[in-house]
Amino acid sequence: MYFKKIIVKMQKKTYKMTSKTEFIGTFCCVDSLNDRKWLKCSYKRIKNTTIYRYHVAINNQQMIQSKQRQQQQQQGIGGMSMLKNILVGQSGGPTAVINSSLYGVIEQGLRNKEKIGTVYGMVHGIEGFLAGNFINLSEVADNEPIDRLKITPASFLGSCRYMLPEDLGDKVYDKLFDTFAQMNIGYVFYIGGNDSMDTVSKLSRVALLKKSDIRFIGVPKTIDNDLVMTDHTPGYGSTAKYVASTLREIILDATCYAHPSVTIVELMGRHAGWVTAASVLARTEYSRNPYLIYMPEHAFDMEEFKKSLKMALEQETAVVVCVSEGIADKDGRFICEYADAASVDGFGHKMLTGCGKYLENYVKAEFGIKCRSIELNLPQRCSSLLASATDIDEAEKAGKAAVVAALDGETGKMITFERDDTNGYEINYGLADVNDICNKEKKFPAEWITAEGTDISDEYIKYVRPLIQGTNIAEYSDGVPVHLKPAYYR
């Protein structure tokens, strides 16, 4: 341990204590490097004041790392060569494990001190970065339990839904690359889904035009599991686990009464039914619910739905139906549009909610029985308490693989998952050209949907089972989960 005489100032509270009392608390410590450090310190009260001079144990490795970074920064200011820095961002819809990928990038970056200087994070994605918002993640890693990212849901850095211009000569690219140069960025990692890979594609192509040696790598993320050229995406396994687990509880609640009823559960999925398909995992040896499962890949017909529901009610008193938000008829009209016109998001995608409510009203009118609709909504994409341990681990490894790829000279690529079932479930991490991935969509395989379009085959169950294995080990304080304080609250 490295012992140093420093000034210790009490944080927030003044405590009444005698001169003999010892207290363990959190304080702001100012050392000779002028770095503010929040540490667990032990001290004795000497006078009636909140400022004390005392000896505090400081981790020697953290001190050395801080000195090294300051020396690198000073060298850069003086015009000498600097180590290239990392810039990482998160974009699109959050997931339960997107921060595990962020942790992987940070951890692998810090591990390569001979090649990488500082790890920076975009606050609110590329949009926030354009506004000058970023954070020094190396400092966060030095002073906080950075591995807590793996149990922190949603996007620690903050997210955005911002599309870079199609015109690669637009001034926004000049601004971005000027800022990259000012920050001595050598590696940019963007964690996200389809539209995020579009950002990686554009930035890597602009770099080529500008003859920039900055390397751009995409790290996959989406609960929709709709990215092409990869077996699956981080975030999907946890969402599948959440959907199956929550559906089991909903089914028990919905079936505990002796009178006929229908419960319609609406799940995320605009054009791909991967999330809704996971509802099949909720079935047990004593209940076939959900009896009916409808996804966007199969045209939805109101009359056929009525017939199928009638048959289900003849076999089961209480029937649970699962539907994707994006189910549509044979003409491509969304069922949610039957009642109201759909609004549009920033990418021009129709914002789909309400098909569950529409079907609820339809069932009440046609069958005259109790019916309620439920939207699992945000928790299905970012609930960390039901996150899959497999998903967390794979997301972290994807982040690490991205750094390794960039240091190997790769750019304009996305990390891919390659399944190997030779000796049980195993994933290898590969690379694919991001231009072959962005703006494309992987549909749920038609052969995994029954001919009537109301059920899922066993092939899917074999595919998804390994992705939901293992349980997240959360940290608790006062009975509720503890997460790492998000960058946008700092």
Which residues does each predicted region cover?
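A glycine- and small-aliphatic-rich helix-loop capping segment at beta-alpha/alpha-beta transitions
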Residues: 103-112, 135-142, 202-215, 232-239, ...
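Cysteine-centered motifs
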Residues: 28-29, 41
